[in-house]
Amino acid sequence: MKAYYKADLEKGEKIKMVGVVSEYPSVNLRGKYSYGHPHIFLEGDNTMPDVPDWNGVVKATLVPPTDLYLPVLPYKCGGKLHFPLCRSCAETESRVLCSHDDPEDRQLKGVWCAPEIKLAILEKSYELRQVHEVYQYQGEVSFNPETQQDGLLSGYVRCFMALKIQASGWPEGCDSEKAKEDYMADVLKYDGIIIDPTKVTKNPALRQLSKLMLNSFWGEFGEKTLRPKTEFVYNYGELMQMIIDPRKIVQNLLPLSDACLQVTWKPVSDSEESLPTSSLLHAALTTCHGRVQLYRYLDLVGDRAVYCDTDSVAYISRPGEPDLPLGTHLGDLSDQIGEDFGPASSLNFLLGGPKNYGFKVAVGGDPAKVKVTIKVRGITINKSCDHLVTFDNLKAMVMGETDPLTIPIPRQIARIPGWRVVTRDTSKVWQVKNTKRRRISRGDTVPHGYNKWYMAEQQDHEILEELDTLFNE
């Protein structure tokens, strides 16, 4: 990943930005999902299945390689999700070359879903040191496009994706009956979605509703239950029952009237109850499949990757090196710059941290026609701040030439305690935060624990050796 990169136009370079088409619906459609009750294997069990046969979740200790530019396994520390090659460097957010030679200092211990940990061990040289626990399920199911046999969640996805496609209207090029028939056959062949041609008409409201159903459905499986709850109490006895209940922690009492009291309480973790819709395994598998899908695309571009988000990749396109393939089906990649600007390519890319980046686009491929886009989480760019939130200011912060900026946010709508909504003036500090990878010269970054000599560091090393020789003379 790059903190800053400028495309070399003389060499034919471009910066391309692509996004996965309906990432989570696509993994709900095609991903393998476990079913049944798990058989739990504990450490030392000789009957434990081999790594290629795992299908559930695994608690293990692994040592990452030291030369993997794009790590596979996530590791949470300091309230952040890192992708490190060294645990100690990630926990301290080290900015220097890793010096931890002892595997005990570098190893990661955690719980991962089977698709992710199998990718790490079988394809990316992670060393499996110890398996503490394996949840092995009865089997896996997935959608079969040839037989149209549904998997665990594919029937739901096909239903609402058909509604979304129909509410989007016919795509460009479907001007004849033959073109429409070919389009419907193509969607059925690759996505298993049956389109009713009599219902294909633009309906923005229905499209938005079906999109919401597709993207939010799987989240119900992982809904958090250990959160505050509010009740209204009308007599002293009810209040005392709530206060002395060992399963509840009363957090707030708010008198609403002489006869009514609003009580906010939180369940004790040991007494947490599962919801009828909860299935933590399937929520975890959905995000896992999404990360693996994105990783496959990142792996194709390697160190040409400039930036990645949950479902998007920015990378350097060079003559003679393969570009990421584009498509229109679920899980394929779409050209994000082309969708926003038409035929265009990015010239510069700046990364200030997660959801904090900017890029310049040559519209129509003409460097004289440049448009600038800046995305900053928590800041809506309008007339009140567009003179501060600029490409030049972001570049200055990325290059360490200026301090963080305070951005005014006038008339922000905010919720405050007591169920009140207010409008107030506030501000946000805009700053660069690159703490999940180690910054090296020229704007490049590498994972924490990456020890393979990088060209810029090698040049620095050679310069230091030459200076040392001169001083010794």
Predicted regions located by residue number:
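Conserved acidic
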Residues: 1-473
